[in-house]
Regions:
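Amphipathic alpha-helical segments at domain termini/boundaries
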Residues: 1-62, 182, 198-233
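Short glycine-/small-residue-rich flexible loop motifs, especially phosphate/cofactor-binding loops
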Residues: 26-27, 77, 113, 178, ...
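Long, structured ligand/cofactor-binding scaffold of large enzymes
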Residues: 35, 40-166
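Conserved catalytic cores of soluble enzyme domains
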Residues: 127-233
């Protein structure tokens, strides 16, 4: 019995997943002055040291019995090395539904936190998502809505007393993403590209009746003064 066909099929599926949210969304990410999550991980880690976990987690599309497309989960994680030291790294994929919760595989993000604690390895979060709440798309998929929660938050908090935790806000970050940036020992933003807030300008305007720009609400200058991040003026 040969496994050659199965191995080739697995490789094909990995290639589909590596396409992230598709060429159009990748191009949009680049035009916004931002790298994709895979490009970020590739530049961060030592060459060829990244060992990905859960690459095929996501939503599959079939034509009969043949897989024709994969929408991967919008979170990429694994282990790698920085200057020879082993670390755990996890990053949001903004090219898949803007990092929204309806395209996530919840256990995948939580696993990155758990494995870092279990292996006693530094944890690096590359945050570029819209949070952990629901959306209209969530309602379309599940037929219901829900009150956002994070049952794994105890793991996030526990990590602060056990391992080094670093976070980088690499785009507009709201909700749970903002909490993940704040709950770290060292955090950084990209000036003019990153904003960190609990809720974005449309929600704030609806609540207070006053329009506000995202830089004024949660830009790097605001967050450095408020103590939300340690370094908010990095340039790319």
């Amino acid at each position: 019995m040969s496994w050659e066909d199965d191995v080739e099929e697995l490789k094909r599926r990995m290639e589909l997943a590596a396409g992230m949210g598709g060429a159009e969304n990748v191009e949009r990410q680049h035009k916004a002055g931002r790298l994709t999550v895979r490009e970020r991980i590739d530049r961060l880690l030592d060459h060829s040291s990244f060992h990905e976990t859960g690459a095929l987690a996501g939503a599959a599309q079939y034509d009969g019995e043949r897989l024709v497309a994969i929408r991967p989960a919008n979170f990429v994680m694994g282990t790698g090395r920085i200057d020879g030291r082993r670390v755990v790294v996890g990053g949001d994929d903004f090219t898949v539904r803007g990092g929204a919760n309806d395209a996530s595989i919840g256990g995948k993000q939580g696993y990155s936190e758990r494995i870092a604690r279990e292996l006693r390895l530094p944890l690096i979060r590359l945050v570029d998502g819209t949070g952990g709440g629901g959306s209209v798309k969530t309602y379309e998929i599940t037929g219901r809505t829900y009150v956002p929660g994070n049952p794994a938050w105890d793991i996030v908090v526990a990590a602060m007393s056990e391992i080094p935790v670093v976070a980088a806000a690499l785009g507009p970050v709201a909700g749970l993403g903002a909490a993940r940036v704040a709950c770290s020992h060292f955090s950084v933003m990209v000036r003019g590209i990153s904003q960190v807030f609990v809720a974005g300008p449309p929600v704030v305007e609806r609540a207070f009746g006053t329009p506000i720009e995202k830089e004024a609400l949660g830009g790097s200058d605001i967050q450095v003064r408020a103590g939300g991040v340690e370094i908010g003026r990095a340039h790319v």
